[in-house]
Amino acid sequence: MPSTREIRRRIRSVKNLAQITRAMEMVSASKMRRAQRNVLATRPYADRLLDVMGELTGRAVGMRRGTLLEVRPVVQGVALIVVTPDRGLAGSLVANVLRRASRFILDEQEKKHTVEVLAIGKKGRDFMVRTHQNLVAEVTKLGDHPRLTDILGISTHVINGFLGGRYDEVYVLYSQFVNTLVQRPTIKRLLPIDPPHEPAERMVDYTYEPSQEEVLRELLPRFVEVQLYQAVLEAIASEHSARMVAMRNATDNAKELQRDLTLSYNKTRQANITKEVSEIASGAAALAEM
């Protein structure tokens, strides 16, 4: 049985740990709220861009070939953009994303497709290097408030790769923010773009300058950039949410362990007192018999 001194030392250690995890929980909660606001702030622009894309592609029939809309009959090259945090302590979030990435890569390789990986985030980068995947580009240290320009290198790489024939399909894997308790690993196809087609009765007769084909060609890359940026923002919100929940669970576990250690301390202390009283009583009885 450990001594009371050892138990007291463990109680102090657990108490300090609970204070740290509680502070991390509060920081993550604040960051999560800001990340949620960032996600919501970009949605109106993304939704409006999607509407314009649907209206344009509904009119520009036969313009898919040679653009980011082209669906190729034979797929050979596939690019996977994996979005993960730079840091850990986020529960099972990172493991779930990387497990989904491994399964996707294996499935594509079984189809005889060449898979190239682009990593956004240190955790994903390290995993791809460790498992000897074909990592061709990486972006790390984005922070909690990334800008669209921070990921332009990745989006430009896949756009040029698609137009040049290096990639026939491009996917992004990220953790979708559902709510505070649920973050879902999600794979979305970025290229070729499959925008919604507006019904004829909903179309408005706009005038495009210089032409609707030129406008569409300019919008297609912007659409890919916004979709990737949206995925990164979702992943950041998911990261802080998962870390907040993980730190809350760690705090609760530390408090429960502290209660158990306190109970053990009291029992050990009571046993020591009982032993001392018994020894004193035995000594007094022995003296009385002399």
Curated annotation (Swiss-Prot):
As for subcellular location, the record says:
Cell membrane
Q: Name one GO cellular component term.
A: plasma membrane
Could you cite one Gene Ontology molecular function of this protein? proton-transporting ATP synthase activity, rotational mechanism
Which chain regions cross the lipid bilayer? Answer: none
A Pfam family the protein falls into: ATP-synt
Q: How does it sit in the membrane?
A: Peripheral membrane protein
Q: Which NCBIfam families match?
A: ATPsyn_F1gamma, PRK14111.1
State the protein's name. Answer: ATP synthase gamma chain
Q: Which organism is it from?
A: Roseiflexus sp. (strain RS-1)
